[in-house]
Amino acid sequence: MRLAVIGGGWAGIAAAVEATAAGTEVTLIEAGRVLGGRARSVSIDGRTLDNGQHILLGAYRDTLALMRRVGADPETLLERRPLAIHDRSGFCMALPAWPAPLHLAWGLLTARPLSLREKLRTALWMDGIKRRGFRVDPDCSVAEWLDAAGQTGQLRCHLWEPLCVAALNTPAERASARLFANVLRDSLGSPRSGDTDLLLPRTDFGQLLPQPASRWLGQHGARLRFGQRVRSLSPGDHGILVDGEAFDCAILATAPQHARRLWPEIGNDFAYEPIATVNLEFGPKTALPFPLLNLDGRVGQWVVDRGNGILACVLSGQGNWSVLNDAALVATLEEELRDYTGNQRAGWNKVIREQRATFSARSGLERPKAETTHPRLLLAGDYTWADYPATLEGAIRSGLRAARLALSRN
């Protein structure tokens, strides 16, 4: 079978590797010069940076398995740390490396500054949603869900709402409670304590998957076409035509706005949310007290210590930050970080903005399935994995699913 995979992001990579491993003749077509999509490394001013700062969780089992499959060792490339959330106000919730659910119980019991009453209320709420299988009304927002549960205190401000924005890239007032519940189910609510671990890259994102996958695909006979933007898809006599070239099957693994341009029957376009990553380089001895910090500021959100004095500030969803120009944004973040940088100004900075970084994970959102109106055309991409918001794990799972569906139609 001749299979075209259109789009070389993480979903397209997963689809191409899965199909190639099964002996399929795969052609992977990517408009850019490298694989990786929105999670790739870029060279700027002689520095190798990530196109956007991403954090993986221990629950990303399919992502980790795919890394191993293409020869990228997660144990070497990722630093595994028990989940610990700290913010500038002094809030702290740290989970020990204990079996589940003891790790969560201890983390909640020792979280500060929280009243005993709030800890008990939260423990009962978490137990209740777990007993209900994390099922939530699909039309309910995260804010409405938290209101109904009486989650109105410190944990809402310092944990639930920041986690919501980080995981769904959508403010709690608009974000889907069902998707947020699914994230909690597979992390804090998982029966495996390691699922909550933070997996912090020791290297740039290109070396985690895109570059090893590119080598693996080439070594196993797949054709990689870079710099080719697909202009048309149309039904063929026995398959699908990609820019007039006949394939038995095709997997459309581009971002949804590009997929809809090629195949309008996919349906209505999504609303989108932006993400900015602000890279600030201070002196080499500058370091955060924690690898991950919630700035909890007027503008700043999450900060990741990349080592060697480089701090990556991640700003998700529409907010105060999105109306600031790059210079004003850098100056504001330098001010909010001054307690950790000794009032230094960054000697170098780079702001990377993605205006359509992810679909807006709103309540009641309808997501397309992998199947289309043409039996030989399948979709892949985080927007098609309806169980999750826009995550790398969702992208990987969608690509694997699309490849397996394509193989079943041979």
What is each stretch, according to the model?
Residues V183-G239, C249:
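Helical element adjacent to the flavin cofactor pocket in flavoenzyme catalytic cores
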Residues Y60-L64, R68-R69, D73-N182:
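Mobile amphipathic helical/loop "lid" adjacent to a hydrophobic cofactor/ligand pocket
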Residues R40-G58, M126-K130:
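Glycine-rich active-site loop/strand segments that organize a redox cofactor
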Residues T20-I44:
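Glycine-rich FAD pyrophosphate-binding loop
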Residues A22, Q228-Y340, P368:
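Mid-domain catalytic core of redox enzymes
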Residues V303-N410:
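Conserved flavin/dinucleotide-binding core of flavoenzymes
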Residues R2-L28:
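N-terminal Rossmann-like FAD-binding beta1-loop-alpha1 element of flavoenzymes
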Residues H54-R61, V136-P138, A149, P191-W216, ...:
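Short beta-strand to alpha-helix junction loop
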